Amino acid sequence: MPTIEPVTEADVAALEAQLGRQPRGIVGIAYRCANGEPGVVATSPRLPDGTPFPTTYYLTCPRIVAAVSTVESEGVMVEMTRRLEQDADLAAAYRAAHEAYLADRAALGDVEEIAGISAGGMPSRVKCLHVLVGHAL
């Protein structure tokens, strides 16, 4: 698991501005943008209201979110999934990322409802680049 920094009051204010809502279930800051603001938050696998939440690494940096949204809108997930089917080394690396994601989430808590489910389509397809970029950062 990457180093997770504690959340400050300034972080919460920045996250509210980034998200347009109050952040939920934040465990800490997993990545900071160049300006020092949160870029990726680590989120509890169970939200305060009891809802299971498989997205451990939630991308919040507005510039990165916008860039990833542009790439997603171009439909690259289909091509990326095709590459996973054709390239055994790439598929093995993607499976390893899936396992690492599950291990990171397990370190934050065990939630039976989402056991074995990572995020972003892992390990067999590419579904949500926001999750994958958040994990990579």
Residue ranges of predicted features:
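Preference for intrinsically disordered or flexible, low-complexity segments
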Residues: M1-L137
